[in-house]
């Protein structure tokens, strides 16, 4: 499945699968790169970028493409999904080398979750590295217990390993201890490379299970912000999560946008502690992804028009939203006088297919509440759900 990778200068050799676009034109600039901002726009296709830039030549995305270097034939790993895709970007590996095929897989060597006495236990376990790991998968803070959600989510810990329910983890038969996501990964990450060089690292993603990006050391990311995207949204008790309504997805992405802006300004993700701008940091956007998946949301049709290339009204709005946030990042970098030392990497963990709506067959889904979903069963996006709400979301 083709994904988009927009780049200019490859600042770190470990970034083998991604590319970057400098904030300012740098053809004559030999300033050393000190900061790399990696942005994954989940669901973004090469054709989306071409369409958007052609129709919005003065946009922030157009500026990145114009001033940077574009790799138009990049491919996502197979299988193509968020977990293996993100791991691929920060390791340069594919599932056969990283050991990460999917966030829900079968392992023939590990023991079932919850095993405490490992003698004579038959190996074989479903490894579920998604929202099921959260101490409270229905809470935006994954069970931390913050009092003022969703508005206070930036107070969420930057060490989400503490929010993982160890009884949901597979067990190593050799040690009889739970295997955290970072221990499941077979290779190191760019975050670990940076840490070994004495550099600061940060990242924002959608589940606590993304502590996998810490790498085998478990310490690759110093500030990891992981608000739970499949939690009840926008407030506790809601029958939907942040993916069931595109305006809610934008609101969710805004929390991560603010975290990155805080980091550009030299603070931790919460904006409370002055720690310096990270050497490697970034986030993933979900807004484009849900705009492609949802048949309709906020009174707008999702996906593409009949040509399979032109974004429909919901997806067009999502692309404008992402462009606006990229513009904010670029401006913040300039405001901090970091534009001569920063590279922006615009990419995607995965795309989505088919783009042609005539080739898409939707499977009807139940409209049951997420609260009634038993633990151990993956929640299903209730794509048939819709309601009238504002079509704008402020970051």
Describe these PLM feature segments.
Residues 8-18:
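Bacterial N-terminal signal peptides
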Residues 17-30:
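C-terminal region of N-terminal signal peptides and the immediate post-cleavage residues
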Residues 33-46, 63-65, 89, 194, ...:
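Beta-strand elements within well-structured catalytic alpha/beta cores of enzymes
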Residues 49-99, 200-202:
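Short, structured active-site-proximal loop/turn typified by the sulfatase FGly-forming signature C/S-X-P-X-R
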Residues 56, 72, 79-81, 100-159, ...:
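Secreted, luminal/periplasmic, and some membrane-associated catalytic domains
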Residues 91-104, 202, 218-267, 304-324, ...:
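Acidic, His- and aromatic-enriched active-site or binding-groove loops in soluble protein domains
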Residues 138-173, 178-239:
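Catalytic-site neighborhoods of secreted/periplasmic enzymes
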Residues 207-208, 212-230, 268-321, 358-360:
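Active-site His/acidic residue clusters
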């Amino acid at each position: 499945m083709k994904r988009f990778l927009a780049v200019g200068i490859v600042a770190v050799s470990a970034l083998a699968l991604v590319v970057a676009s400098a904030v300012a034109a740098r053809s004559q600039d030999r300033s050393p790169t000190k900061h790399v901002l990696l942005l994954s726009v989940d669901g973004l296709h090469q054709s989306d970028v071409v369409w958007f830039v052609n129709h919005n030549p003065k946009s922030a995305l157009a500026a990145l493409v114009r001033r940077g270097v574009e790799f138009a034939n990049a491919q996502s790993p197979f299988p193509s999904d968020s977990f293996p895709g993100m791991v691929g970007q920060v390791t340069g590996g594919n599932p056969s080398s990283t050991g990460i095929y999917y966030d829900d897989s079968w392992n023939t060597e590990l023991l079932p979750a919850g095993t405490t006495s490992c003698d004579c236990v038959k190996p074989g376990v479903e490894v579920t590295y998604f929202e099921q790991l959260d101490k409270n998968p229905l809470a935006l803070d994954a069970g931390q217990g913050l009092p003022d959600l969703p508005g206070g989510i930036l107070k969420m810990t930057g060490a989400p390993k503490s929010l993982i329910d160890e009884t949901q983890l597979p067990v190593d038969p050799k040690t009889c201890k739970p295997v955290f996501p970072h221990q499941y990964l077979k290779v190191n990450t760019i975050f670990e490379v940076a840490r070994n060089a004495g550099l600061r690292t940060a990242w924002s993603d959608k589940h606590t299970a993304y502590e996998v990006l810490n790498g085998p050391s478990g310490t690759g990311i110093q500030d990891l912000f992981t608000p739970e995207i499949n939690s009840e949204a926008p407030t506790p008790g809601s029958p939907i999560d942040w993916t069931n309504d595109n305006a809610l997805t934008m609101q969710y992405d805004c929390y991560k946008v603010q975290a990155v802006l805080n980091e550009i300004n030299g603070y931790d993700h919460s904006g409370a502690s002055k720690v310096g701008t990270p050497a490697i940091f970034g986030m993933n956007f979900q807004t484009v992804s849900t705009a492609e998946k949802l048949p309709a949301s906020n009174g707008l049709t999702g996906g593409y028009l009949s040509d399979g290339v032109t974004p429909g009204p919901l997806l067009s709005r999502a692309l404008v939203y992402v462009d606006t946030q990229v513009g904010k990042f670029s401006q913040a970098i300039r405001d901090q006088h970091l534009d001569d030392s920063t590279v922006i990497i615009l990419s995607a963990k995965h795309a989505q297919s088919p783009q042609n709506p005539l080739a898409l067959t939707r499977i009807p889904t139940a409209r049951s509440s997420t609260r009634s979903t038993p633990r151990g069963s993956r929640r299903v996006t209730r794509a048939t759900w819709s309601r009238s709400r504002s079509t704008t979301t402020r970051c």
